[in-house]
Amino acid sequence: TMATIYNYPYYPKQMERMGYTKDQDWHEFKIYIPDGVPEKHLRIGEIVKKKYGLKVMKFKNAKSIMPYAQKVFRTLNESYAPLYGFARLTQKQIDYYINMYIPMLRYDLVTLIVREEDDEVVGFGISLPNLSKAMQKAKGHLFPFGWIYLLKALKSKPKVIDLYLTGVLPEYQSKGVNALLFNDLI
C-alpha cells in the first residue's frame, strides 16, 4: 500500500494530446471485510507463524511501538524498493515521520509481524479510520468546528478503514505473511 496523488479522469487524455505516453498503471482496490476471519486464513496464518517463527504484535500506546518504529521504516524501504517511482527514505525523513505521525496513530489499527528469533519486523500494516464522511460533514474545513468531526471519526469504532502503509520484506512475500496481517485487521 502506498499513498499516491489523485488525478481527474480527463488528465490522461489531456497528457496524451500534449505528446506524453503512459509509463505506469496504478490500481486501487476496495476490499470488503467479512464478518469473521475465514477458517482457511486462520489455518494459513498458524502455519506461516510456525514455519517462519513469526509473531503478531499489537500496541496500546506510542511508548510500546517506539522500539519498533525504526525497524518498520527499514522494512518499508526494503519492501517498497522494487516499486516504480519509490525513493528510499533517508534517516532524517524517517526520524521526522516517526516524531510527526506515531502520536497520531490508532494503535489498535497497527499490526506488526515480527521474527521471534531476532525481533526484526518482517511485515507491517498501518491503518486509520476512513475520514471521508467526517470531511464531508466538516465541508472540508478544519476550523472553526470541522476538527470535531475528524476527532469523532478517529476515536469511534470505524465502519471503513484505509490501509495507509502495508509492507512485507521481499524474502517473505508470497509466503502467507500478508494473511497474518489481514487476519488481525478482520
Predicted regions mapped to residue ranges:
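Acyl-donor binding region in acyl/amide transferases
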Residues: T1-G19, Q24, H141-I186
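Short flexible/disordered coil segments
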Residues: Y32-G53, G85-Q93, V121, Y149-L154, ...
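Acyl-donor-binding surface of acyltransferase catalytic domains
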Residues: T1-K60
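Intrinsically disordered, low-complexity acidic/polar segments
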Residues: P38, A134-Q136, K175
